[in-house]
């Protein structure tokens, strides 16, 4: 039985390698885009249209068909399946697949070659640098190559880095009892989550704080008018009268002092990413200062954190570990664990007679996202904290 299982594992591995090679070939040759949805197409005509070998195209289709990707309804004809049609109609999936084959796979296969470098956290000494014989870090390459950056973002989104996960976690919290309270969302990339919560709880007021470089990330189609009573804030149109937007860079003082809940979307907590961790500590410090004067308020910090081994469904954990290895191979960073977040909280200087403490943790159902519920607690009054608002 063990021999059979090991043989099956190896054969599945070989199959997936060739599937990825075929998907890369289909992506580069534009076959998926040129093949119309809902009807078959001649192999010969499609090969001529895409400028590829008819024989190779036929062989590629017959292999991917074993995974339900493309089909040969009759000899000499090719047709989309629902799976391949989804790839053909979604540029994000195509970008993610090309990134997987063109960047991640070569980098992953150089991981063992980094052994001779010893224990290094330098972003310029990663498996990616060895694979592409470059001293430029992966993140620098993304900054100067828009296509690479687009594909990287597509890969992240298709491996679980979705705003939907944050929204799903936040909607599980008890907002109803807050009445007409103010909710601040800091480090946001859009007003999407505020709009969802506003529809569910129309009495709540929201202030969405976008970081400076991302200040145009919200829906610019909305009609925006200044709110005279709060300088620097613009308000959305009449469809969302309780949502305001302002610009605020992470780490700066929090200008809204009377909110009931502060939602904070944190950047990477990777131990190797020192600048990012420094910003996180400053941001936690800024909100600790607010909570020390408003101890009834709650801080909800969202971050990507690895689940403890075996604590979630195997497929979910597998994708979390895949993202962790991807970071290691491309940047020498890694996804943090809960203990890493606890270390950052402990690095925040105590304010007055108290400090920040984690009262609860909520994990997304299908990925790395965790919402940490933090409260301000006086050092002289330890004890159990409520697990919700």
Swiss-Prot record:
Its recorded name reads Geodin cluster transcriptional coactivator gedD
Q: Where in the cell is it found?
A: Nucleus
Gene for this chain: gedD
Sequence ranges assigned to domain HTH iclR-type in this UniProt record: 13-83
The Gene Ontology CC terms held by the record are: nucleus
User: Which ranges does the entry annotate as DNA-binding region?
Assistant: 43-62
Q: Which organism is it from?
A: Aspergillus terreus (strain NIH 2624 / FGSC A1156)
Q: Which PANTHER family match?
A: MONODICTYPHENONE CLUSTER TRANSCRIPTIONAL COACTIVATOR MDPA, PUTATIVE (AFU_ORTHOLOGUE AFUA_4G14580)-RELATED
Q: Which UniProt keywords apply?
A: DNA-binding, Nucleus, Transcription, Transcription regulation
Main location group: nucleus
| GO molecular function list | DNA binding
Keyword Heme included in the entry's annotation: no
Q: Keyword Ubl conjugation on this protein? A: no
- Purpose of the protein: Transcriptional coactivator; part of the gene cluster that mediates the biosynthesis of geodin, an intermediate in the biosynthesis of other natural products. With gedR, coregulates the production of geodin.
Q: Which Gene3D superfamilies match?
A: Vaccinia Virus protein VP39 (3.40.50.150), Winged helix-like DNA-binding domain superfamily/Winged helix DNA-binding domain (1.10.10.10)
Alphabetized InterPro entries for the sequence: SAM-dependent_MTases_sf, WH-like_DNA-bd_sf, WH_DNA-bd_sf
